[in-house]
Amino acid sequence: MFVNTVIAFIIIFGTLVFFHELGHLLLAQRAGILCREFAIGFGPKIFSFKKNETVYTIRLLPVGGFVRMAGEDPEMIEVKPGYTVGLLFNKEDQVEKVIINQKEKYPDALVIEVETADLEHDMKITGYEQGKEDELSSFTVSETSFFIVDGEEVQIAPYNRQFGSKPVWQRIKAIAAGPIMNFILAYVILVMLGLIQGVPSNEPMLGQLTDNGRAAEAGLKEGDYIQSINGEKMRSWTDIVSAVKENPEKEMDVAVKRDNKTLHISVTPEAVKDENKKTIGRFGSYAPTEKGVLSAVAYGATSTVDVTKAILTNLSKLVTGQFKLDMLSGPVGIYDMTDQVAKTGIVNLFQFAAFLSINLGIVNLLPIPALDGGRLLFLFIEAIRGKPINREKEAFVVFIGVAFLMLLMLVVTWNDIQRLFL
């Protein structure tokens, strides 16, 4: 069971992160931004392959992911005056590769001492060839050229391929696409569940009965149409639930229409405690379901909206103090919930995945620096001001945001450990 839970956790969390980052990747590529890496997880690489311009990687720690876009790189490679570099050329006599070190491994490279280098706008390098130190040469650099550092290729990004070069509305779309993709994923999962298992209906009928439940023991069957309970007409499934809850361990006269006949069956609901410790009745029947494309589409939409509202309500309670910080869950808590839900069946596991996907989308839209919501806030401010925020100031605010998130992660992880193991 432990192995099954680990696999389920990795698949669910990995899928949510994959689609989130896929949203960023697709919109960034559509805007013409060079995406250097698409990563699932953080830390050391476990697996990687390159397709077109992007390296796709799976990393050791399954706690998130990222899309590394040109212009946002923390390790920018610079070619400054006085540097000695090697140049390799394509068939059009444009520089195809700029060799930063280990030039001895490339005997065909033209070695120059750099005088000037503009690898963002003009795409030119000037310098002095060895043996021609009195003659300044100029070289055009291809827009699809590479640096070679320690034997590895790093694509050079002209300014028009960098994140910051794009209109603010394109950058907003690239950042917002991640959380939006999580909402789309949740909606698709819920629609699929609606198509496969049916959509809950409010008709006054019985759905699937639980084994050894009071309804099954009394002789009720799935599909029975409940006309009345104790003489009171039942107009909906909601009416049935209310009547059953009000009669714990009390015999009820249930009028049932079955095969065009009316039957009277006595049922005594089991007494159970609800979430508020109040005693209510339960007789072991699920809500009826109906199948159809339109009903599944509507179910996906309404369920996505309902879950979103519930999460936002809890977030507002967290701000007002009605919802305590120690009630939040981190990766450890989510793992435990995955374990509990996995035991109840694959359908509930998919519903849980949809809930987590919406949760991930909402959390990432919070205006906290280092999250997508924080980046969107900076971009909206830029759109209003007409110019970007100072990069150093933005970097400082993002650093504070990262520190806050790390602290929050430690707190919720400690809460999970205390709640589950101590």
From Swiss-Prot:
Zn(2+) binds at H20, H24. Its main location: membrane. The keyword Protein transport does not apply. It is a multi-pass membrane protein. CDD domains: cpPDZ_EcRseP-like, S2P-M50_PDZ_RseP-like. GO terms for molecular function: metal ion binding; metalloendopeptidase activity. One of its GO terms (biological process) is proteolysis. Keywords: Cell membrane, Hydrolase, Membrane, Metal-binding, Metalloprotease, Protease, Transmembrane, Transmembrane helix, Zinc. Its EC number is 3.4.24.-. InterPro entries: PDZ, PDZ_6, PDZ_sf, Pept_M50_Zn, Peptidase_M50. Residues 186-271 form the PDZ domain. Its cofactor is Zn(2+). One of its GO terms (cellular component) is plasma membrane. Regulated intramembrane proteolysis (RIP) occurs when an extracytoplasmic signal triggers a concerted proteolytic cascade to transmit information and elicit cellular responses. A membrane-spanning regulatory substrate protein is first cut extracytoplasmically (site-1 protease, S1P), then within the membrane itself (site-2 protease, S2P, this enzyme), while cytoplasmic proteases finish degrading the regulatory protein, liberating the effector protein. Belongs to the peptidase M50B family. This is Regulator of sigma-W protease RasP. It comes from Bacillus subtilis (strain 168).
